[in-house]
A protein has these predicted regions:
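Class I (Rossmann-like) S-adenosyl-L-methionine-dependent methyltransferase catalytic domain
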Residues: 2-56, 61-115, 129-144, 149-237
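Conserved acidic residues
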Residues: 118
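A conserved beta-strand element that flanks and buttresses the S-adenosyl-L-methionine
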Residues: 121
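Short catalytic micro-motifs in class I SAM-dependent methyltransferases
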Residues: 124-128
Length: 237
């Protein structure tokens, strides 16, 4: 079986996330990363002048961050592995009268997007990758970006993941309270600043990695929850 067809390949992950976006998971109709508004971090980055040129929203989900930037006049492309998420994002764009492109793509390849982007935003995609896949992702972004492009990577931390898991477990019976033991189940999966730094070591310079908050939602209650995260800013060489 090839990696692409294996349990961690894009085909398997498409099925997993499509089911989530169809409402066929313990989260119900709303997964915890679909907060119904842009992430406050990216609102602040845009206001600070740190978004520019052609923008890629990598792992865009249903498009809230991409649509926020499109509403500000940016040329935005949102890419996601899930056709269901992309369809929902396109519907939102049409309903709001916003001009944004949404397509299905594998973030570890980004074939056909070479040299297209000046800014990347990522809400919670990088933190799903182990060390090897994170390096492949950074390499794909390098190919898709122009020299000097900035990648803003918002990635939940170990502490934030534990906070979110505990709150979800209180609200949803099917979700266990403790996080899985990553050391045994996925040895390369970490949620540290060093994990991000190492992943973007080739072809990128690290401008900053700072502690911040990522916003999630507790699906049954619609409670918004801000938990600890890392914000990495990387510049393409």
């Amino acid at each position: 079986m090839s990696e692409a067809d294996g349990p961690d390949g894009p085909g398997a992950m498409t099925e997993v996330f499509d089911a989530v976006y169809r409402g066929e998971s313990p989260f119900g109709k709303r997964p915890p990363w679909e907060i119904g508004e842009p992430q406050p971090v990216y609102v602040a980055l845009e206001e600070a002048g740190l978004i520019g040129g052609a923008v890629l929203d990598a792992g865009c989900g249903t498009g809230e961050d991409a649509l926020h930037l499109a509403g500000k006049g940016y040329a935005v492309t949102g890419l996601d592995l899930s056709p269901t998420a992309v369809s929902l994002a396109r519907d939102k764009a049409a309903e709001r009268g916003l001009d944004a492109v949404f397509d299905v793509a594998d973030a570890l390849e980004l074939t056909g997007y070479e040299g297209r982007f000046d800014t990347v935003i990522d809400v919670g995609l990088a933190h799903t990758f182990d060390a090897g896949r994170l390096r492949a992702y950074a390499a794909a972004l390098h190919r898709a970006c122009r020299p000097g492009a900035l990648a803003h990577i918002l990635s939940i931390s170990d502490r934030g993941a534990a906070e979110m898991q505990a709150r979800l477990a209180e609200a949803i019976a099917e979700i266990p309270a403790p996080l899985p033991d990553d050391a045994s189940e996925s040895p390369g999966l970490r949620r540290s600043a060093d994990h991000l730094r190492d992943g973007f070591a080739d072809g990128w310079t690290v401008e900053s990695i700072t502690g911040t908050r990522i916003r999630g939602v507790v699906p049954p209650t619609a409670e918004l929850l801000d938990v600890h995260a890392w914000l990495g800013r990387f510049r393409r060489i």
